[in-house]
Amino acid sequence: MDFHRALSALFTNQAAVQPLLGSLGFPFNDGTSILTTALAAQSGGKKLDTPLGILPFDSLPTTNLLTPTKKIKLEDELCASPVSSRSSTVSSSHFSSPQRSPSRKMSVPIPEEKKDSAYFERRRKNNDAAKRSRDARRQKEEQIASKAHALERENMQLRGKVSSLEQEAAQLRFLLFSKISPANSEVSCESNDSTETNDSNDSKSDSTIEV
């Protein structure tokens, strides 16, 4: 059943439709006028108006929608607020700028009228303290240099001892090998003599057997 037939069936039975619309809480007072308008529009081939006040998406007002330009403006306004600018400056200064070391104050020349005895006494104490500091630093550097010289000299002595011990070990090794080699030659000579005597005894025994 198409839409035209459904509307015509509802329009013909208005007495039954009216209490149903009232029981459902239909927002319009006159249900027959809605049905009549819908039926006339459907029969004429016109586009139906929305009877319940529901607007299509295209006809909705676009004031509440965020367009790209409005979004950019909103972000600019948020960035321009004092709280965000303060937090951004604090964060940027905390992460980007390195921590500066405390710089020394520029020396300001003291006028002649202020150079009294207390000033000269303070200058003398400062000069004495600076001299003591220089002397202590120089003494410490001299101690380090003398200690390094003593360690280098001890290192050279130890290297000389190591080389002399290596030479002595080489000489002892040579003497050990030279003592082992004559003993081996004597053992070989004794073995040769024993083999010769055995051969001579064997030849004598053979000659006696032949006689």
Swiss-Prot record:
* Record PROSITE patterns: BZIP
Q: State where the protein is found.
A: Nucleus
Broad class of the protein's primary localization: nucleus
Region named Leucine-zipper: 144-172
Specify residue ranges for compositional bias: Basic and acidic residues.
Answer: 111-152, 201-211
Could you name the domain of life of the organism this protein comes from?
Eukaryota
Q: What does this protein do?
A: Transcription factor. Required to activate programmed cell death in the sister cells of the serotoninergic neurosecretory motor (NSM) neurons. Negatively regulates the activity of ces-1 which in turn negatively regulates the activities of cell-killing genes. Binds to the DNA sequence 5'-RTTACGTAAY-3'. Involved in the development of the excretory duct cell, by positively modulating embryonic transcription of putative transcription factor lin-48, acting in concert with NFIL3 transcription factor homolog atf-2.
Q: What is this protein called?
A: Transcription factor ces-2
